[in-house]
Amino acid sequence: MNKLSTKLVVAIGIGSALYGILGLWGFSIAPNTFIKPALAILTVFGALFGPVAGLLIGLIGHTLTDTIAGWGIWWGWVISSGIIGFTMGLIQKRVGFSVKNGTYNKGDISYLAITGLIGIVIAIIFAGAFDIIVMGEPFDKIVIQVLGATIADVIVFLVLGLPITIGLAKSNKKHTHLKIEK
């Protein structure tokens, strides 16, 4: 593994703190399941800094949320946040894509949307399976949580995460179609 740069470590720290603190707020939709706008942090930071940053922000941030909330650390859900962050960061590996430089195309946006949605589904199914197998949670409760969490995360990703990331990229474009009139 390559050494983590100071900039990347700082980004992971800031992203983890934001994700961890913002993860304390949400709107309940099922037992212990919330629509949490904090998921947008994983999208933005993953797209800005890549899959390793997304993974670590998800893992550290979710652990922070669970610790501060006092309900104990639910490792399946912590790992699922890491998976989501990792998949959101895969976009940064595409040649020509850069939120920082404002370079992207429709294919990049489609790629982010698809990898993000796939990542959410895989991560939430993993968390549910982990809760059933390792934590001994009842199957019927977990089905409701998995469905609720998947719907909630998809909504936050499509309504906040994706548009914010695209907006940042657009605002960082180095050129415009404006022309100076003489």
Swiss-Prot record:
Location in the cell: Cell membrane
Keyword DNA-binding recorded: no
Membrane topology recorded in Swiss-Prot or TrEMBL: Multi-pass membrane protein
Keywords recorded for this protein, A-Z: Cell membrane, Membrane, Transmembrane, Transmembrane helix
A cellular component term, taken from the record's GO annotations: plasma membrane
Main location: membrane
Highest taxon above the source species: Bacteria
Keyword Transmembrane: yes
Regions crossing the membrane: 9-29, 40-60, 71-91, 114-134, 142-162
One Pfam family cited in the UniProt record for this chain: ECF-ribofla_trS
Stated family: Belongs to the UPF0397 family.
PANTHER family with a match to the protein in the record: UPF0397 PROTEIN BC_2624-RELATED (PTHR37815), UPF0397 PROTEIN SPR0429 (PTHR37815:SF3)
Name used for this protein in its record: UPF0397 protein BCE33L2384
